[in-house]
Amino acid sequence: MMATDYYIVGNLRKDYEESYSKLGHRWKDYAQRKYDIIDKVQKDGLLLVGINPSFDESFKGSCEGEVRDSENGGYRHPYFTKPKKLNEEIGISDFSHVDMFSLRSRPQHVVQDIVNDPDSQGFVEEQLRLFRMIVDGASPRAIVVVNALASHLIRTGRALGALDYDDVLGVAMYKIGEKRVPVFYSGMLSGAHTIDNGSFDRLIWHIKYVLNMQSVFF
């Protein structure tokens, strides 16, 4: 049995830490929270993409940067329950999830505001560069984007550059070398605005269909 291979996200912690010096001054309180990243993601598996880690907004003051242990509580938050179920249904890899931004905030509009802030573009571009490094390093078999803003940044080409669209399979394709990686856009899988069960089942079917067709014809 082959050993599981991983891309080590934790090796980028210094780059993540340094990126906060490029965050606009109005966001200094968020800069003090520093980064929150997962330690690793599985290569050649299913990669789920969110927008940013949550945070207990009642906490005040600075934090230490955190590299969460994926095998020991790194995915313990209830948010990951439905994404884990999706991963189990697809069944091609261990659970792997990465956020596009490492900034800690519960209200997601904060990330949207930072993306739109002219004084924070250095931070945004550096975070997206690191995100691309993770995706390219993991070289997943499929990407599932489970956040509207993350989907927008990918669809518009800002996060991963221009994607091709496969009209036959009905999915966008991201190229890593010669490898064509299907990108599926989904609504939230957890929380107040989660997709309904029918849409969830359809997502599972579509992912399985595309992966099966790729294995047959590519």
Predicted features along the sequence, with ranges:
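A structural signal for short, well-ordered beta-strand segments and their strand-loop junctions
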Residues: 46-50, 91-100, 142-147, 185
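Short, solvent-exposed loop/turn segments at secondary-structure junctions
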Residues: 52-56, 101-105, 148-152, 188-192
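Low-complexity, serine/threonine/proline-enriched polar segments
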Residues: 68-109
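Active-site and ligand/interface coordination hotspots across diverse enzymes
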Residues: 1-75, 79-85, 127-130, 134, ...
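Proline-aspartate-enriched helix->loop->beta-strand connector
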Residues: 131-148
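Glycine-rich, phosphate-binding/catalytic loops in enzymes
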Residues: 63-68, 114, 159-163
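C-terminal capping/extension of enzyme domains
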Residues: 1-14, 21, 117-129, 152-218
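Charged, often glycine-rich, active-site loop that binds/positions anionic groups
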Residues: 100-126
